[in-house]
């Protein structure tokens, strides 16, 4: 078992054990073990433990188990204990986020303004920047003047994307953010598709030690046909397909037919203009085709 740190969390990685049904993760303190996570998928090789305190060391161990015919569990021995200290991200890395959504208030509402530290009344139709399209409960949003507010999601109606591809995050901020995510790729490469910046970021290395080597501007899915978010991988590569050079990175997803990295098809890159795929310039796409192996992890966010 190996361990690496992030902000208020640690990531654990291990080699898959054949013939088992799952794993149990224990936090170790004062000589005692406390079960913190049970993993029932035997093919899983990593997990993240959150809710920790930055700057405070935490220790963990694990064991595998096998289910008998009568559902009883037979356990392996415990692994050796590993420790890591979560650390807060820098301001620049903390500022990295996914695509925002333009929204308006549905009615006249009272919200809490974090900047002013008091309640505030917003008129119906007030423009707000929201972090999500599907909103439940209370969320933190921004007014167009940059002030942060707390508002009930049901009081908002989203109507479009807010993105910014004119500028980009720094290399160091990208590496710090990605290395806090405990992302494990089957290859020595990792791809992060930044939907807010309309960028395909290519890293080389291994979990906890990813180094940015390329950043390509891209087109992303539109508000009505969004690019899937989450962790995927490169499933296939085609040189002369329906859309020319393609790398398939999603089976199914929001649009049901899978998504690829492919040619721009006569349109510019750097803004939402696809049906969920990532459109790239031909030279950038060919670099991906020639260098990125099948199985490479794709983090779309």
Language-model segments: which ranges?
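Pro/Thr/Ser/Gly-rich low-complexity, intrinsically disordered linker/stalk tracts
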Residues: 1-19, 54, 71-89
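Hydrophobic core positions of the immunoglobulin-like beta-sandwich fold
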Residues: 14, 47-50
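Hydrophobic loop/turn residues within beta-sheet-rich immunoglobulin-like superfamily modules
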Residues: 17, 52-54, 133, 154
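Extracellular low-complexity, O-glycosylation-prone stalks/linkers
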Residues: 17-37
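Beta-loop motif signature
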Residues: 22, 33, 87-145, 155-181
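Short beta-strand segments within Ig-like beta-sandwich modules, predominantly Fibronectin type-III
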Residues: 37-43
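Beta-strand-rich modules
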Residues: 49-70
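Exported/periplasmic cell-wall-interacting domains
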Residues: 92-100, 104, 162, 167-168, ...
């Amino acid at each position: 078992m190996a361990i690496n740190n992030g902000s208020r969390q640690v990531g654990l990685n291990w080699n898959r054990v054949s013939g088992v049904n799952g794993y149990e993760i224990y936090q170790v303190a004062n000589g005692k073990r406390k079960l913190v996570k049970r993993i029932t998928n035997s093919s899983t090789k990593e997990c993240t433990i959150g809710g920790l305190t930055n700057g405070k060391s935490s220790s963990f161990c694990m064991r595998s188990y096998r289910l008998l015919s009568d559902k009883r569990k037979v356990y392996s021995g415990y692994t050796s204990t590993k420790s890591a200290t979560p650390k807060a991200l820098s301001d620049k890395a903390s500022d990295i986020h996914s695509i925002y959504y333009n929204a308006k208030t549905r009615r006249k509402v009272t919200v809490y303004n974090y900047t002013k530290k008091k309640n505030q009344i917003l008129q119906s139709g007030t423009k707000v920047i929201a972090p999500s399209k599907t909103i439940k409960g209370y969320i933190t949003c921004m007014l167009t003047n940059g002030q942060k507010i707390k508002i009930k999601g049901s009081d908002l109606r989203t109507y479009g994307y807010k993105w910014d591809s004119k500028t980009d995050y720094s290399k160091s901020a990208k590496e710090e953010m990605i290395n806090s995510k405990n992302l494990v790729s089957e290859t020595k490469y990792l791809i992060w598709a930044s939907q807010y910046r309309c960028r395909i970021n290519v890293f080389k290395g291994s979990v906890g030690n990813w180094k940015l080597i390329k950043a390509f501007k891209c087109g992303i899915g539109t508000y009505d046909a969004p690019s899937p978010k989450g962790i995927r991988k490169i499933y296939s590569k085609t040189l002369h397909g329906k859309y020319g050079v393609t790398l398939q990175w999603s089976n199914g997803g929001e649009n049901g037919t899978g998504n690829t990295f492919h040619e721009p098809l006569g349109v510019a890159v750097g803004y939402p203009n696809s049906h969920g795929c990532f459109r790239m310039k031909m030279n950038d796409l060919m670099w991906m085709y020639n260098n990125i192996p099948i199985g490479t992890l794709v983090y779309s966010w």
